[in-house]
Amino acid sequence: NRQASYLEPQGDGKKIRIGLVGFGIRGKQLMRAAGFAEPSWIDKMKEANKLNKKDTRYQQYMEQDDLNIEITAVCDIFDVYGEAAVLTGSNIHREGSGGKFGPAPKRYRTYQELVTAPDVDAVIIAGPDHWHSTIAMAAARAGKHVYCEKPLSWTVPETYMVRQVIKETGVVFQLGHQGRQTDCYQKAEEIIGNGLLGPVNLIEVCTNRNSPNGAWVYDIIEGSNPNTIDWKQFEGDPERIKEYMDYMTSNKLERYIGPDERSKFSLERFFRWRCWWDYSTGLSGDLLTHEYDAVNQIMHVGIPHSATSSGGVYFFKDGRTVPDVLQTTFEWPDRDLTMLYSATLASSRNRGKVFMGHDASMEVSNILAITVDQDSTRYADKIKEGIIPTDTPFYTYVPGQNSSDSVTSPTELYFAKRGLLYTYVNGKRYDTTHLHIREWLECIRQGKTPSVISTLLSKKL
């Protein structure tokens, strides 16, 4: 939905009051994309620029558009995060430590209180996977617009429940597939639409990573203990847990539950929840979801006829139940199309996102390159005449300088190469998450439908 992606902010648009649920890694990133950063992060970015003038993250953040919003409420079940969220929400001038701050948002202990607060117009959800759909539906039923991080849900039935609630309530809903804002993906959609690759029968996507952080072995935060973490709320509704456990045992999937009882307090499970099916959707819900959405955006594939997966826990022997190696094959017989997905968390070798056509192949990331097939029918004469080379790309699209100067960690580099950190609009570099949040807010103001939700509400789901 290109119209939604490029909605220009209205100068007289109303201020939208935001409530945030979850201030962990992604919650902090979403707040920065919305214009509110931790003062300590500002300090860190300033210092990074002093040490390396090519590191322009601070300048880019300060130049980020004001989205005309106010953070009025925050919720996190870890006290350290909750208090940090309050401070961040008051950082209306983007100040470092010791700066001048604005009114502090109210901290709520439960999401139920936040979504029913009268001074909240819209809710951003950045909690663990197993809470996404529950909080999203509660917010929508309370009449709040919703920005929900991917994945949409923890289970398949919940997906349909969320969709129905969105339809019934009519709230503006945005799912956190910020790749929709990536210029190269939109250019790739045009190229496919113009038939430049010929018939495309095979697509290959890959999400390899090779670092502890990339494998979800996140830091245990100082100050975390049973007194500062609401473990009971993290685990969730006992009836829902029982339903999950009954499903797993009845289908002989006990090996995916893990050796520890879910009621047992665990800092590893709290901070590294992505490693356990009890809370996570694994590689498919964390990484494949971005790749699949990109392919769907580019080729409008919808739901496949079949999907087959295999893999296991082959490298990280740390008690996790979620595989660190996964491969999945998707089939669309009616489209004469197959997509192959592969991932390992123990190798950073990248095989790209490649669309293989009869006449040419296209690789898409934060740049786009098309290489002709040496046996192409469409370009046979041009190949024979030496006009189109077969050993190098004959078309490369670079929307902006292909630089990773301000990318400092393996995980950031991973997302940057996929166009999930930044893109370019009219030559200006933007954080894709910032653009995605901006699109959502402008859809609220202008009565439009966000780019991702238009797919979710379609008959293809």
Task: Give residue spans per PLM region.
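Solvent-exposed loop/turn segments at secondary-structure junctions
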Residues: 23-27, 77-81, 129-131, 153-155, ...
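Non-transmembrane alpha-helical segments in soluble domains
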Residues: 27, 31, 35, 86, ...
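A contiguous active-site-proximal alpha/beta segment in oxidoreductase catalytic domains
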Residues: 145, 153-230
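N-terminal glycine-/serine-/threonine-rich beta1-alpha1-beta2 phosphate-ribose binding loop
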Residues: 1-145, 160-172
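Short basic (Lys/Arg) and small-residue
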Residues: 150
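Generic alpha-helical secondary structure signal
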Residues: 134, 154-157, 161, 432-439
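Contiguous beta-strand/loop segments that form the cofactor/metal-binding neighborhood of enzyme cores
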Residues: 186-187, 199-208, 212-456
